Amino acid sequence: MKKHAIGIAALNALSIDDDGWCQLLPAGHFSARDGRPFDVTGGQGWFIDGEIAGRLVEGVRALNQDVLIDYEHNQLRKDKGLPPEQLVAAGWFNADEMQWREGEGLFIHPRWTAAAQQRIDDGEFGYLSAVFPYDTATGAVLQIRLAALTNDPGATGMKKLTALAADLPDILQQENKPMNETLRKLLARLGVTVPENADITDEQATAALTALDTLEINAGKVAALSAELEKAQKAAVDLTKYVPVESYNALRDELAQATAQSATASLSAVLDKAEQEGRIFKSERTYLEQLGGQIGVAALSAQLEKKQPIAALSAMQTTTAKIPSQEKTAVAVLSADEQAAVKALGITEAEYLKMKQEQEK
């Protein structure tokens, strides 16, 4: 669990550039003149770099108010009965008046009050001191909340400063502030689970931001599609290119019905013709109708064309041919055995039939 403490640090001397910028904290590891901090792991003191400085600037920006510069940190002692004239501001600065200079440190551009500027010009104050919370594990500075003009930067010990910090934000007072339960639930909805009594890690924060970015992108897509849908609904339909779906479905059904009727009629015509030509038996018709339904009229017609007509069937199934009297013609159909007998006897079919008729008398 991370622990936070409060630090106070002052430069060796108040140094103001010609353009009004002055150094608030040095770059890298640093400590107070009296050796503080004593509770940072490894004993390397407080620490600030460019990345930390960026967070400090954004932290000040999130306050939505200027940071106070007072005299001798009197704001931390206001509950001790100090007179009002000792609680006045010496100056102010905001996030836009903060600047990180690599290798040098964190600089601010204070807006001094006229009285403070005069006292600085007169040399009444020699140091600029900052009040900040820090991580006891790394020494990293966590926030800039107050600054002060002072002449005794090491006079205030940590115990005394901690006791006087009642008016600072919660982050300066609480070493272990539990995460807001609503925030924990929100992170869980984003797929980021933070254990109870634990701080959110940088990786978890990045995952939450990525999830929010994804939601934002998807929301943009939904908005774009909604706009296109609304536009399409308002636009008039070009009836030369589109027809109502009801009309299309009705036409499709009529076409299917007509096609089925046409196929049935064509199949019947093919079977009638084959039957008249003696290519099929009447008893085959039901089977052939089913076959035609499966393979199609064209395929069935091609198969029937290959079958040899049977003269007897043609004569029996025609409705127009007249069957001549057996007394006037010898035309008849012989069985296979009779045809074999004709060939064996060396006579014609007519002669065979005549012989057969005489035997039947």
Curated annotation (Swiss-Prot):
Pfam families recorded: Mu-like_Pro
| A GO molecular function held by the record | peptidase activity
- What triggers expression? Expressed in the late phase of the viral replicative cycle. Expression of late genes is activated by the viral late transcription activator C.
Provide one Gene Ontology biological process annotation. proteolysis
Query: Main localization of the protein?
Result: host cell
Q: Where in the cell is it found?
A: Host cytoplasm
Its GO CC terms are:
host cell cytoplasm
What modifications follow translation?
The N-terminus is acetylated.
Keywords carried by this UniProt record: Acetylation, Host cytoplasm, Hydrolase, Late protein, Protease, Viral capsid assembly, Viral capsid maturation, Viral release from host cell
Free-text function comment from the UniProt entry: Protease I is involved in virion assembly and maturation. Protease I cleaves the portal protein to yield mature procapsids competent for DNA packaging. Isoform scaffold protein Z probably helps the capsid proteins to assemble into a functional capsid.
Q: Which family does it belong to?
A: Belongs to the peptidase U35 family.
UniProt protein name: Protease I
